[in-house]
């Protein structure tokens, strides 16, 4: 092992502290940018699915505290009247790394499996674990899903994508309300069935979804750039450390 004199070791340590400190600062800037961009996404979705795209639309009180005012021509309905709900019959051990179909479990990661039990448009929600009521997926095609994942499908009066964006953004209020009373470690069927949704006319839903898709696409592109900058900064930091401790650059 190469071991420079103690004076040189101290000089290298001081050099690395300065250089790495600046790089870490730049990384923190990018991480904060990503946090702000994710907050912006949530704000865009919230405003679009509860207020619509017309800022001059007449508003009325929804009667639901966490929804607030909505355009007066929108409807308010509970989820039980908007879709069918069922759970899967598979466990995580059924996954196959090279499986033919998506396998929705209780985490943001989509696994693979060689079977499918559903073919169509659906919104999947984690029913328990750390992702309970917080992990959602939109699917349209053949897939399988975990026994503690809710499959919301056969949508009525609401498009699948509008439903997805709404519940992705708003179901957290149900979780927070439950957490204020006790620990929420699972989502019960009645919590989904009794969940209130705003329902614009179908044509308006389509315009809202198109708007959200476009805005999120632009934001995700910025997030990807920020993540790439973080990768490059970490690579630069590692390169500087390697060169300094192997004597490839002179620091004193």
Name each model feature, range by range.
Residues 4-57, 198-252:
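Amphipathic alpha-helical coiled-coil/heptad-repeat segments
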Residues 36, 66, 183-186, 191, ...:
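Residue-level recognition of specific faces of alpha-helices
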Residues 79-91, 101-112, 116-134, 140-149, ...:
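Short Ser/Thr-interspersed hydrophobic loop/turn segments at strand-loop and sheet-helix junctions
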């Amino acid at each position: 092992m190469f071991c420079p004199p103690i004076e040189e070791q101290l000089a290298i340590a001081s050099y690395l502290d300065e250089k790495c400190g600046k790089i870490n600062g730049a990384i923190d800037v990018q991480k904060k940018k990503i946090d702000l961009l994710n907050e912006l996404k949530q704000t865009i979705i919230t405003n679009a699915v509860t207020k619509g795209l017309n800022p001059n639309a007449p508003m009325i009180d929804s009667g639901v505290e966490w929804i607030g005012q909505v355009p007066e021509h929108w409807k308010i309905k509970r989820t039980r009247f908007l879709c069918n709900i069922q759970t899967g019959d598979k466990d995580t051990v059924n996954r196959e790394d090279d499986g033919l179909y998506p396998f929705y479990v209780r985490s943001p990661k989509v696994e693979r499996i060689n079977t499918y039990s559903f073919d169509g448009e659906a919104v999947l929600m984690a029913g328990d674990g750390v992702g309970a009521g917080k992990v959602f997926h939109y699917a349209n095609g053949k897939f399988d899903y975990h026994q503690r994942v809710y499959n919301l499908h056969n949508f009525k009066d609401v498009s699948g994508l509008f439903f997805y964006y709404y519940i992705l953004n708003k179901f957290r209020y149900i979780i927070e309300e439950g957490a204020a009373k006790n620990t929420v470690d699972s989502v019960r069927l009645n919590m989904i069935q009794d969940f209130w949704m705003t329902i614009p006319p179908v044509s308006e839903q389509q315009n809202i979804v198109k708007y959200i898709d476009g805005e999120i696409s632009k934001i995700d592109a910025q997030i990807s750039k920020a993540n790439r900058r973080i990768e490059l900064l970490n690579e630069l930091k590692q390169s500087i450390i390697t060169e300094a401790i192997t004597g490839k650059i002179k620091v004193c």
